[in-house]
Amino acid sequence: MKDEMMAKIMDEVMKKMGGTDAPAQSMACEAPQGINEDLCGLTEYVGTAMGHTIGLVIANLDYSVHELLKIDPKYRSIGILADRTGAGPQIFAADEAVNTEVCMIECPRDTEGGAGHGCLIVFGAEDVSDARRAVEVALSFVGKHFGDVYGNSAGHLEFQYTARASYCLEKAFGAVVGKAFGITVGAPSGIGIVLADTASKTATIDPIAIATPGNGGTSFSNEVNFFFTGDSGAVRQAIIGAREVGKQLLKALEPSEPLESGTVPYI
């Protein structure tokens, strides 16, 4: 049943999606999938989540690998979140984790053939239990943050919001810790520019950065990402305004295909 649900959800967020309906229930608070030895008995394995996301942990990282990754020597243990589809959902999910430091965030060009990214996040911890818990927490929030990801065979849209950004979002996107933070993502990239313009005109927000295919911010993916902060209500309103415009534009590229949330919209 879980495999069936995953297939349905991924149909909505990856390039090769079609007419599959989105599941009716929210996965926002669901426990991480696959945390049992039936799927993988290795001690490094923590679990999986949508977007072909896998959670891993290394209790005592080899010294040479530790050094090459440039991780603070005090962190003997690391937690890893890696995926094929999505960067925003996993990064916002990782922002919920505590008692660890985010040592690395990289967004490879991926989306399994689509227009966007995959993601690699590494947590550092002095105790392996903290590293494992950080990965478990992040996995449990991935489904929620796919709630405002929309896609068809022509491209995708992504909208993320938090009322209070923490250190993962600061490291990844330059968010102000403790303040409301939002992002809009549009692919093809021209749609992303319209989303940024719409968000800025919808409410009074403070832009932080814009990532385009060639300015080093998107690993040359065919999308534009807009990052901003401000009053919580304004940030939320800016995202809602951009979302309405973006869905109309992306739908125009493939009018016959559904354009629905991957899980349940949360903004």
Name each model-derived stretch.
Residues 2-86, 108-118, 126-127, 146, ...:
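A structural signal for small-residue-enriched, beta-sheet-centric alpha/beta enzyme cores
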Residues 80, 84-98:
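N-terminal low-complexity, intrinsically disordered segments
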Residues 99-100, 127:
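A glycine- and small-aliphatic-rich helix-loop capping segment at beta-alpha/alpha-beta transitions
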Residues 133-141, 238-245:
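Short amphipathic alpha-helices in soluble, non-transmembrane regions
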Residues 121:
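Long, structured ligand/cofactor-binding scaffold of large enzymes
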Residues 93-97, 138, 195-199:
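Buried hydrophobic packing segments
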